[in-house]
A protein has these predicted regions:
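Glycine-rich tight-turn/loop motif centered on a GG-T
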Residues: 113-118, 164-183, 214-234, 268-287, ...
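Structural recognition of the beta-strand scaffold that forms the well-ordered cores
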Residues: 50-56, 111-116, 142-148, 152-154, ...
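N-terminal hydrophobic targeting/anchoring segments and the immediately downstream early-domain regions
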Residues: 1-178, 186-187, 197, 202-205, ...
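C-terminal non-catalytic regions of proteins with extracellular/luminal or membrane-system context
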Residues: 1-19, 71-78, 82-90, 95-98, ...
Length: 682
């Protein structure tokens, strides 16, 4: 097993980590020196192979228990005798679905890894320390940077976001925008960062600065909505919450994406797939999509990821943004003066082989005709610094040795990458405490905060909670509702007794056993606080339904996780929902990961109460329905009236669908809150 380098002391008493194992404090090991001086010293010591490894940002799948393998080897799929991945999972022993290489760190000099899964906090902390020990045993001891897509929401998509794993859940980023409260967003982002730091994750592959101007696009839940000004405010708060006011040892660095704006996808198709290779700018509105990035740069975003797609119709080169010198050098470097790390979106260069399941092509949109070495040279000429998802430093070495790329160009990128490692304090201490990790992740305070953000993001679209609160009051029985039970997701947490997001009506005298509720997609334990479950609407006093926004099911290992296509409920489903509403007073909450067409749920045939949510626990939705808790959220995009209106709108222009049912910025009336009836803009 690797031996952790000891903490030594310089002759003047300065403590340092002896990363190159020579017993002397070299300038790059000296914590007193300016970052730029340390970077220059380390860069001068590196071989071309070591530099090339630093420019690869691979993937990693830790074992489920975080236990290092007996031989000390590292595999990029979490080997320790138990590979796994999509369809298997870490530690399951199923066939690996990610490429393995026990020498990624030691031989290939790769020391950036995006985590494809995260084991429980203590296990993840142990794994981080094992990885850092492996890095410390290399010639120069350059520490590893572990990164991750979002892990604090409700979406589970292996290519874009994750949920669970013990982290405190808030709504999706679109729900953060729905709170319209930058102070609350910054507080939640800071809590998120603290949990990530506790397990060793120091680079966030988020936030998204893209605008939700094309309603069909599958990635809208990861954005801050359609309004560029609101998105800018949210980005400022989120980045400052994650990083602080400057990048240092208390920060989680943010990689803002997908420059210069991924929202205007042609026909709403996502650029992970060939159908979404191009964007559309019929409104010539690129400048509008740059505005949220300007806010991110002003907030100090450390890194940037360009999008896969071709910015067609903008006057920029007709190649994907990661290959596009007009985008990376012209816009990002020269116009905006950005000198941080630019990392390509993942597997834009070589694609990905998933043994036994699928081969995912490179998202090399616009340069498919080029060979892989030619693509690499094009990327480097464009100005990128790291290759997302790639573990092929030999291609970079070959490009330099062939004369296609100068080593000074490689040095410029390595300098940026090293700078962030030093600023994050990784050279001083990349380790975390496994015994403290579990108590620091998912604390009562951060869970309460996450639930508060969830509650604040709920948007009242139409109707009133009055039929449901009345039904509770008029059912005879004993007072069984205690008003503030503990969070059902963390029943041992007494701190949740004060959760302001879990309020009910403490004066309600009804016995839950006497209120018959027909429910769909709601946990029975949460519903038991308010009523007993019945099997059909006809048996019920009231009905409460939680629905996903409509989408078209797609085939394919990854594409099935992307909600794309039509935003309308199929006719049969719309008729079924209206039949439930006709049978009994009904509340419907729709998870708006995209701007759904909710026309069938409006008017007299619709529900008594219609809510838009962006990821919220069942009991919080039920509190809004039964408890009279105000619906405070602000709609972060227009909700269109029809798919025809969507098809006729321009992908790059906000608020462009004709006669939307609800406008961006809609909020349920104040005053009586959920008791007051309100309606769409018909």
């Amino acid at each position: 097993m690797p031996v952790r380098p000891p903490l030594l002391h310089h002759h003047d008493g300065t403590p340092f980590r002896d990363l190159n194992h020579n017993g002397t404090m070299e300038p790059y090991e000296d914590p007193r020196l300016p970052v730029e001086d340390r970077v220059a010293d380390l860069l001068a010591r590196m071989t071309l192979e070591e530099k090339a490894g630093l420019m690869c940002h691979g993937r990693m799948l830790p074992p489920a228990d975080g236990t290092p393998p007996a031989d000390g080897a590292l595999s990029a799929d979490g080997a320790s005798g138990a590979p796994g991945g999509p369809g298997g999972g870490p530690g399951t022993g199923t066939p690996s679905t990610l490429p393995t290489d026990a020498e990624h760190i030691a031989a290939r000099h790769i020391n950036h890894f995006a985590l494809m899964a995260v084991p429980p906090p203590a296990a993840m902390a142990r794994w981080n320390n094992h990885v850092q020990d492996l890095a410390a045993a290399t010639r120069l001891g350059i520490p590893v940077t572990l990164s991750s897509d979002p892990r604090h929401g409700f979406t589970a998509n292996p290519a874009t976001a994750h949920s669970g794993e013990g982290f405190s859940a808030g709504p999706e980023p679109i729900g953060l925008a729905a709170t319209d409260d930058p102070g609350l967003v910054r507080e939640f982002a800071a809590a998120t960062a603290a949990e990530l730091r506790a397990v060793g994750i120091r680079l966030a592959l988020h936030p998204m600065a893209d605008l939700a101007t094309e309603p069909r696009w599958a990635r809208i839940s990861g954005t801050f909505g359609e309004d560029a000004d609101r998105a800018g405010r949210m980005l400022d708060a989120y980045i400052r919450g994650m990083q602080g006011d400057r990048l240092d040892g208390t920060s989680v660095a943010c990689m803002v994406k997908h420059f210069p704006g991924h929202g205007p996808q042609a026909l709403g198709e996502d650029a992970h797939f060939a159908a979404g290779r191009a964007q559309a700018f019929p409104g010539r509105n690129l400048a509008h999509h740059l505005r949220p990035f300007e806010a991110a740069f002003a907030a100090g975003a450390a890194q940037v990821m360009p999008c896969y797609a071709i910015p067609s119709g903008t006057g920029l080169a007709e190649v994907g943004a990661g290959y596009n010198r007009d985008v990376v050098t012209g816009l990002l470097r020269e116009r905006y003066g950005f000198d941080g790390v630019v990392c390509t979106d993942f597997n834009a260069l070589t694609g990905m082989e998933i043994p036994g399941l699928a081969t995912l092509p490179a998202r090399a949109w616009g340069v498919e005709h080029l060979s892989v070495p030619e693509r690499l040279v094009t990327m480097l000429d464009a100005g990128v610094d790291q290759l997302g998802g790639e573990t092929c430093p030999e291609l970079i070495v070959a490009a330099v040795r062939s004369g296609a790329v100068g080593e000074e160009r490689i040095d410029a990128s390595v300098r940026r990458v090293l700078r962030d490692k030093f600023r994050l304090g990784l050279f001083e201490d990349p380790y975390v405490d496994p015994e403290r990790a579990a108590p620091l992740v998912g604390t009562p305070r951060t869970r309460r905060l996450g639930r508060t953000v969830q509650r604040r993001s709920l948007v009242g679209l139409s109707g009133s909670a009055e039929p449901f609160t009345t039904a509770r009051r008029t059912k005879p029985g004993s007072p069984a509702d205690t008003g503030n039970p503990a969070d059902p997701g963390n029943p041992a947490d007494p701190g949740n007794l004060t959760d302001p997001g879990n309020l009910t009506d403490p004066g309600n005298p009804a016995d839950p056993e006497n209120l018959a509720v027909y429910a769909e997609n709601i946990a029975p334990a949460a519903l038991a606080r308010y009523g007993r479950t019945v099997a059909t609407p006809e048996e019920a006093d009231v009905a409460v339904l939680r629905l996903a926004a409509p989408y078209e099911h797609r085939e394919g290992l990854l594409e099935r996780h992307f909600h794309s296509g039509s935003l309308e409920f199929p006719a049969e489903e719309a008729a079924r929902l209206r039949a439930v509403c006709a049978a009994v007073p009904t509340a419907i909450s729709v998870f708006l990961d995209r701007p759904a067409v909710l026309a069938p749920l409006t008017g007299p045939a619709g529900p008594a109460l219609l809510i838009g949510d962006f990821g919220a626990d069942d009991d919080l939705v039920l509190d809004a329905v039964f408890g009279g808790v105000p619906l405070e959220g602000v709609l972060p995009f227009d909700l269109p009236s029809s798919m025809r209106a969507v098809a006729e709108s321009r992908e790059d222009v906000p608020f462009d669908t004709a006669a939307p049912l609800w406008r961006c910025g809609h909020r349920a009336p104040a005053g009586e809150g959920a008791q007051e009836r309100f309606a769409p803009h018909l």
